[in-house]
């Protein structure tokens, strides 16, 4: 029997379940079903959910839409973890209820940092000079 190599990445099933969990959490937060003052005043985007291969653990990446009070939003999400886990378990039929872990999504910050670097005049000059050297 062949063993799955580590480099293959998540299976289609793991990706599908992660997307279902993301959709359910987004719906709960959009409706305001969580009775929390911080979450009521800060719209939150669930950007990605990464499931473990056994589907028992989910890492949920969240980002406040206005980009403010990220730590307060994360604390509120973590405070309401039990409620959110229960709701996900009720709405998605799985053998085990996934344990949710909330983390801040820094991908937007990293993308804007890279964009700023690429727009830097020194970098633009180097990129333009590199293109001319490749043509000869």
Swiss-Prot record:
Coiled-coil ranges (or none): none
Location in or out of the cell: Cytoplasm
Gene Ontology BP annotations: maturation of SSU-rRNA
Keyword Lipoprotein: no
Keywords: Cytoplasm, Ribosome biogenesis
Main localization (coarse): cytoplasm
GO cellular component: cytosol
GO-annotated molecular function: ribosomal small subunit binding
Pfam families: RBFA
Name of the protein this chain belongs to: Ribosome-binding factor A
Organism classification: Bacteria, Pseudomonadati, Pseudomonadota, Alphaproteobacteria, Sphingomonadales
Name of the gene encoding the protein in the UniProt record: rbfA
